[in-house]
Structures are given as C-alpha cells and as structure tokens.
Amino acid sequence: MLTWLTRDSLTFPPLEKALHDPNGLLAAGGDLTPERLVAAYRHGCFPWYQDGQPILWWSPDPRTVLFPEELHISRSLAKFIRQGHYQVSFDSDFPAVIEACAAPRDYADGTWITDSMRAAYCELHRRGFAHSVEVRREGELVGGLYGLAMGRLFFGESMFSRADNASKVGFVALVEHLKQAGFVLIDCQMPTNHLHSLGARAISRAEFADHLARHLDQPSGASWVR
C-alpha cells in the first residue's frame, strides 16, 4: 500500500516498502520544502512527478550510480575535451541551468521539472545544497547539469545539451571535481545509455542505503567556485 505523506511530518517510510510496480514508488504527497527535500535525499528517495499529479517519491531497485574512479571517457570524447571547444564553470548560473533542464525535449512529452520543482531547487542552491555545472561556448550556455551535494555523495538530478558532447563535457568535469574532493558516489537515479557510456552501473537499493549510512555525514573538500 502506498504511503501518503502529511505536511506536518518529514518522516518517510522504510525504503523496503517501495512498490515493485511501478519500480521504486515509495510515497506520495507532502511538499517541496527545503527541509523535506533534504530529508528525502538523506533517506534515499527523490521526487519525480508530472504537472497535475501529486508529488511522488521514488527509491528504485536497482539504483543507477557512478563511482568516480569508474568514469569512462572514450577516446573520441577525450580528444574532444582536449580540443577545448567549451568552458566549464560551477555554480555560476544555477537558475539558467535548471531552466534549460526543464525545457521541453524533442523525445519526451512535457517535463517533470515543474515550476514548483524549479523554485524548490533554486532555494536549495541558495542554502548551499544544490549545485550546477555550466558548459559555455563563446559565452553561450550550451550544456549543463545540476544536483545536490551531501557529505561525500552527489545526487544528480538532470542535465541538458544544446551542442555536441556539451552535457558529457560538463559531467566529466563534475566527476573529476568530485573525485579530487573525496566524493565516493554519484547517484544517477535511473539508467540511461548516456550515463552507462560514461561508466554508470546499477547497484542494489540495499547497497545504495549502505553508502548513505557511511558517507552522508563525512566531510568533503569540495569547493564550488571555479
């Protein structure tokens, strides 16, 4: 049975209570306050829903993640990066990145990044939890991604690309940055061919929860000014 959250409690049900079909649906309802969102990521779930639906909270099993030391950069991508087509920055324009991620895609109907989601994550950015990667070509924003950093874990949310390899260049820069700062895992949530090509793989929900328990409260050396 699906658990419905109330606005007066930040408690989520145990992850093992998530439904098998649809895979990982853990709870519904609640709100998108910064406190609830932080509690959700610390618990191992994330919001994902369409306009017109209640807020839905997910903890899929298996979970797609990338360990920084397993980043795979193809020869062609490595050559492209060396050619220096793009300039990469962190946290220089979070609102523009999430707006671009929310824009309609040719291959999808609508977007799951609603206006309320954008406002909520911009507030998390102001509070120092959410961070962005900007990829520019001659000053124009052509790619990027955003997510949350907690302890030594990074929770990826969405990425976009308006030019060849732009999101891949941004992702590689993020992984290298996180690796240097001592991060141990990047949560990619759901599988995609794009992420698998960069080294992401599936782990069990139990293994993911173990990483949360061990690394959420460990300090990292990440600096988000670049």
UniProtKB/Swiss-Prot annotation:
Its EC number is 2.3.2.6. GO terms for cellular component: cytoplasm. It is an enzyme of class 2 (transferase). Disulfide bonds: none annotated. Keywords: Acyltransferase, Cytoplasm, Transferase. It holds the Pfam family Leu_Phe_trans. The keyword Transmembrane does not apply. GO terms for biological process: protein catabolic process. It is found in: Cytoplasm. Coiled coil: none annotated. GO terms for molecular function: leucyl-tRNA--protein transferase activity. InterPro entries: Acyl_CoA_acyltransferase (IPR016181), Leu/Phe-tRNA_Trfase (IPR004616), Leu/Phe-tRNA_Trfase_C (IPR042203), Leu/Phe-tRNA_Trfase_N (IPR042221). It comes from the Bacteria. The keyword Acyltransferase applies. Belongs to the L/F-transferase family. HAMAP family: Leu_Phe_trans. Functions in the N-end rule pathway of protein degradation where it conjugates Leu, Phe and, less efficiently, Met from aminoacyl-tRNAs to the N-termini of proteins containing an N-terminal arginine or lysine. This is Leucyl/phenylalanyl-tRNA--protein transferase. It comes from Pseudomonas entomophila (strain L48).
